[in-house]
Amino acid sequence: PMGSPVAYLHLDLLTKLVHDLRDTKTRLFVIIGAASLKLPDGQRLLDQLLAMPDHDQWIGVPLNQTYEYEFLQMIDNVDWVAVSPSRNFGPGPTNGYVMGTDQVMVDAKGKSELSNGNMALAILDEIEAPKHRRQRFTVRNQEVDE
């Protein structure tokens, strides 16, 4: 659950994986949440989430996934890549995706959505033809007319 008192285990696992993979050729692929993405005003999505009422009941995972990204940015001896989904992530069609870097992406209708099928497609594309080394990228659903 998002408010889990053991949300810190996300970061614990990542630090162990980084330790084990230091100075190896094995690529570390990390799926982190959208909370560390930036909004148009320059704030992180996390800042907006922290301002919501009763956030303490569910903020543990988004907060710790932001810590994961901050930690990864300090790592220069592991071949890592991280991916953040759009704000709304869940079931849906696999019809293509649009890739970005550190900003919350929205379509022409202002929606920030990503289906699990399009997330899988983006991950497989990155594994088969790497474009990001020690970087994070984000993806959103491609609109039908894009």
Indicate where each model-derived feature is located.
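Oxidoreductase cofactor-interface core, primarily capturing Rossmann-like NAD(P)-dependent enzymes
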Residues: 2-7, 24-28, 34-146
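Glycosyltransferases and closely related glycan-assembly transferases
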Residues: 16-24
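Charged helix-capping and loop-helix junction motifs
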Residues: 9-16
